[in-house]
Amino acid sequence: MHEMSLAVAAIDLAAEQATQRGFNKVTALWLEVGSFSCVDPDTIAFCFEAAAKGTVVEGAQLHFQHQAAEAWCYDCDKTVTLTERGQACPECGGYKLRVAQGDSLRITDIEVS
């Protein structure tokens, strides 16, 4: 379950940013989850709640934003949207693809008080 380590990293980063700026509470956190990130939002929410106990992030609302996977096709020189790993290019049917976005998890916003 890699979601626990991801949740802990997000908590640590949010807490660090809040305290560096003189805030003592993180009230909400927005995470962008790529469709190829292999991150389950329900699992990371569970891990987030458990790992946040006793930190300035405890009780913060967790919001998820979905990011579609996009790839560059070397065969047709187009950026295409993909729905699953291993999929052929929807434009030309080629398999020479490089994922350009949608394979990551990142914090997009932090709300503090």
Curated annotation (Swiss-Prot):
**Biological source species:** Aeromonas salmonicida (strain A449)
Return the protein name: Hydrogenase maturation factor HypA
Keywords tagged on the record: Metal-binding, Nickel, Zinc
What's this chain's function? Answer: Involved in the maturation of [NiFe] hydrogenases. Required for nickel insertion into the metal center of the hydrogenase.
Taxonomically, the superkingdom here is: Bacteria
Question: A Gene Ontology molecular-function term?
Answer: nickel cation binding
Which residues of this UniProt protein bind Ni(2+)? H2
- Which positions, given as ranges, span the membrane? none
Q: Which NCBIfam families match?
A: hypA, PRK12380.1
The protein's gene is named: hypA
Which family is this sequence assigned to? Belongs to the HypA/HybF family.
Q: Which residues bind Zn(2+)?
A: C73, C76, C89, C92
Protein's GO biological process: protein maturation; protein modification process
- The reply on keyword Zinc is yes
